[in-house]
Amino acid sequence: MVRSFFRTYNECYDGKVYNFVPFTKEEIEEEIDQVMGQLDKRLCCVLMDSDNEIAAFGVAIPSLSKAMQKAGGSLFPFGWYHVLKALTDFTYLDLMLEGAAPKWQNTGISAVFHGMMAQQFQDCGARWALANPQIETNTAVNVWGRYEHELWRRRRCWIRKIK
């Protein structure tokens, strides 16, 4: 199922998001070994279709920002305590990945998916979810318009050819 997740991830962003680079097989194996075991299942959601294929997915992690601020940016000598405590406190979540398989895009599956994720987050005690930077030209992020939200950070990149 994990390899299927990465295949769906590559399919849902490839050619749709500017400058997207798909995971290679080697990178997928490395991510499986290093990251997948660390994720909290309560903060992840995978919707399967009737063919047992991934229709939509989402991965969130507890935010470590405040913990690293308290630790002064260092794990030692006592910063590790703040990080471990933050991993069990779900007040703030960082939304890492979200997507839908190409055949399920624009079908309303995002409404089902976001409803399930919101309920899971509330059950864990989360009050805030912070999305990672999103390209303004990515129309799929329009889903946030249905939620009470505040744009509090904007990042832009301009491209200029050097002659």
Model feature map: region roles:
Residues 154-163:
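C-terminal "cap" of GNAT-fold acetyltransferases
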Residues 69-71, 105-108, 142:
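Short conserved micro-motifs at the rims of enzyme active sites and ligand-binding pockets
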Residues 91-93, 121-135:
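Conserved GNAT acetyl-CoA-binding A-motif
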Residues 1-99:
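A conserved beta-strand-loop-helix scaffold within acyl/acetyltransferase catalytic domains
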Residues 123, 143-154:
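Conserved acetyl-CoA-binding loop of GNAT-fold acetyltransferases
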Residues 78, 92-101, 105-121:
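Conserved acetyl-CoA-binding loop-helix of GNAT-fold acetyltransferases
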Residues 100-105, 131-141:
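Conserved beta-strand-loop-alpha-helix junction that forms the acyl-donor binding cleft
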